[in-house]
């Protein structure tokens, strides 16, 4: 028999040791690949968390007297060796071993036979829930950091403050300022950060000890493992802990979709304003055409917009997995891993691109004023002026609309009108100074100066606290491991 076939058979035997006791035949190769090949590739992102979870679990087994401290020390030493290898990028997962949990256990058992005791009072069901929650905590923190960076870039961009157009139905609406535009998007991101912070509290509960579905009769200490891993508390119910896999993932993806929708809105504004030549795209974040020499394309902004659509698809993928599954653990939920990992990566990349590109935008102030003049953006203020003079607003609205129609016909702007012309049409006396105040783009835009972007978000402090809590838990776990490793 060729050596590679012998090796594969040996690998299958190793994998089957986890659950092969009641089987007479080895798993079909195609079926095994269908179950594991893609999953194992994705599991690479969970290696560090799986090892860390095992370190805490073994410490707990020793603390509770379930395994001897000497045995625990040997297992922990082996786990540390695997951890070091993984940190150096030298620990690759074998698809034939089904998942990250089996790969880690096999690597530990190859170092010490006591590795076979590592899985006592534990199931891969609560393991994968643990790994996922640990990954999600870090992911939420990293995405939050990326959003805070995007907020900071909006603050930096707002310092270039100038008159800025607003639009409804993609038509010119009213004059505002660049600061006003930046503040609006800053507010959107604040909501994104708030949602992520709220989700973090739900994610930050430890499922370890839930077992396959109904817990375990071993005398485990779930509070201890939760503390070692930096969780606020153990989850309340084992069946819910393993049976709700995919729910938190779908919730995160829903929040990321909303954040990406906000990013898409920013990107689309940039694209449209560049098309109107009101802003100049930075060379560093533009591309050209292979055929047309004059082109300067907003490709990264278009791709951010496109990736928002991807995020929606990933959310629907994850949310769909929750439908029509019975209570307890089901392998359908494995599919949520792809959506989760892709979603986090997509969000971080998109927010980073915008954060770096936005401060480099340049603005053509003359073109912006012309855009507002051509769009008769001060017509609302003109109607308001007439209303302040005693004309009912509905009548003032009609008069202002008629004035705009007349200006369009005569190809002139509101700023070219005289007070006497407007007074004659409106039937009320207004002065030149009052009219100038009402139809001057610069003056009307002043109202938006009241909108200020805070220099620091409260969410930055919350993020810092979460990161510090995880660091403290790492230090505690390291201390407990060292106490058992001689």
Regions flagged by a language model, labelled:
Residues 9-215, 220-226, 288, 417-447:
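A helix-coil-helix interface module used to build multimeric assemblies
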Residues 66-67, 231, 391, 412:
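Helix N-cap/coil-helix junction residues
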Residues 10-53, 114, 277, 292-486:
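Glycine-rich cofactor/substrate-binding loops
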Residues 77-85, 243-246, 402-407:
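A short structural micro-motif
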Residues 133-139, 144-145, 159, 165, ...:
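Charged, flexible cofactor/metal-binding loops and thiol motifs
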Residues 59, 63, 84-91, 109, ...:
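Charged/polar positions within long, soluble alpha-helices
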Residues 59-67, 180, 250-258, 381-390:
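Short, well-ordered beta-strand elements within core beta-sheets of diverse protein domains
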């Amino acid at each position: 028999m060729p050596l590679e076939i012998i090796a594969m058979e040996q690998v299958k035997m190793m994998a089957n040791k986890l659950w092969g006791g009641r089987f007479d035949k080895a798993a079909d190769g195609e079926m095994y690949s269908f179950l594991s090949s893609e999953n194992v590739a994705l599991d690479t992102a969970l290696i560090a968390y799986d090892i860390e979870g095992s370190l805490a679990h073994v410490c707990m087994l020793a603390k509770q007297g379930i395994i001897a401290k000497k045995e625990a020390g040997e297992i922990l030493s082996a786990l540390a060796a695997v951890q070091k290898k993984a940190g150096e990028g030298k620990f690759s997962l074998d698809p034939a071993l089904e998942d990250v949990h089996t790969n880690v256990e096999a690597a530990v058992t190859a170092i010490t036979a006591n590795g076979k005791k590592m899985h006592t009072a534990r199931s891969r069901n609560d393991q994968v829930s643990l790994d996922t929650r640990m990954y999600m905590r870090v992911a939420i923190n990293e995405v939050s950091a990326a959003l805070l960076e995007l907020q900071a870039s909006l603050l930096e961009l707002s310092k270039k403050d100038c008159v800025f157009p607003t639009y409804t139905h993609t038509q010119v609406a009213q004059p505002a300022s660049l600061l006003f535009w930046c503040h609006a998007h800053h507010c959107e991101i604040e909501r994104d950060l708030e949602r992520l912070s709220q989700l973090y509290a739900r994610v930050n509960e430890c499922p370890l000890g839930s077992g396959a579905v109904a817990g375990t009769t071993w005398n485990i200490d779930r509070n201890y493992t939760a503390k070692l891993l930096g969780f606020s508390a153990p989850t309340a119910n084992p069946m819910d802990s393993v049976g709700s896999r995919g729910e938190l993932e779908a919730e995160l993806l829903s929040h990321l979709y909303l954040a990406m929708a906000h990013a898409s809105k920013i990107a689309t504004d940039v694209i449209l304003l560049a098309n109107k030549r009101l802003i100049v795209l930075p060379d560093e974040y533009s591309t050209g055409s292979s055929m047309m020499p004059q082109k300067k394309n907003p490709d990264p902004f278009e791709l951010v917009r496109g990736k928002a659509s991807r995020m929606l698809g990933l959310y629907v993928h994850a949310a769909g997995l929750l439908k029509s599954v019975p209570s307890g653990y089901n392998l359908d939920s494995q599919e949520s891993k792809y959506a989760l990992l892709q979603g986090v990566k997509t969000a971080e990349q998109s927010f980073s691109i915008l954060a770096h590109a936005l401060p480099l935008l340049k603005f053509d102030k003359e073109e912006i004023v012309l855009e507002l003049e051509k769009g008769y953006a001060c017509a609302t203020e003109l109607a308001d002026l007439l209303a302040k003079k005693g004309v009912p607003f509905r009548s003032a609205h009609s008069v202002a609309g008629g004035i705009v129609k007349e200006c369009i016909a005569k190809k002139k702007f509101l700023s070219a009108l005289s007070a006497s012309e407007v007074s004659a049409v409106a039937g009320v006396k207004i002065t030149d100074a009052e009219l100038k105040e009402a139809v001057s783009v610069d003056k009307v835009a002043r109202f938006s100066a009241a909108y200020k972007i805070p220099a620091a978000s409260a969410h930055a402090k919350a993020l810092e606290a979460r990161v510090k809590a995880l660091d403290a838990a790492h230090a505690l776990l390291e201390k407990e491991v060292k106490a058992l490793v001689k």
